Amino acid sequence: HGDSFEVCKSCVDNGFSSVMIDGSHLPYEENVALTKKVVEYAHQFDVTVEGELGVLAGIEDDVVAEKSTYTKPEEVEDFVKKTGVDSLAISIGTSHGAFKFKLKDGEEAPPLRFDILEEIEKRIPGFPIVLHGASSVVQDYVTLINQYGGKMEGAVGVSEEQLRRAAKSAVCKINI
């Protein structure tokens, strides 16, 4: 998971068979340009590239986002065509980080936006889709951790039901 050409190039040069370039924090055209540059370099060495459209809230590998921005289905076809990526990470309501969603009593985690996923699948049928930040948080473990002094009150993740539904779609990889 890299946020620069240099990081991805270093991974390719050091023998990685795939890289993930996260330009989602950039304006659309800059994301396209950065992702395309990584793809052009990586493909010379038969290295696959995952790109990302839409911003996931949270922190991952020093990429910080305060709030999530859903992937715009109308951008995916253009992005895939212009960049040549091999797979595409999208934002449909997941989040990076250890705690996912912090809920108050009586609240439920927001559902994933399967309407966005379905629209993306229509626009790029059969194309490999990736969900980042899609881990689940087993409530029995949260209770046990809190019982022994941990502080994970209200921590939940993506429900197993939603993960199963995503896995039945074009989602080929779910990162936790």
Residue ranges and their predicted role:
Residues 131-136:
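Short catalytic/ligand-gating loop segments at beta-alpha or beta-beta junctions
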Residues 2-128, 139-156, 160-169:
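Alpha/beta enzyme core
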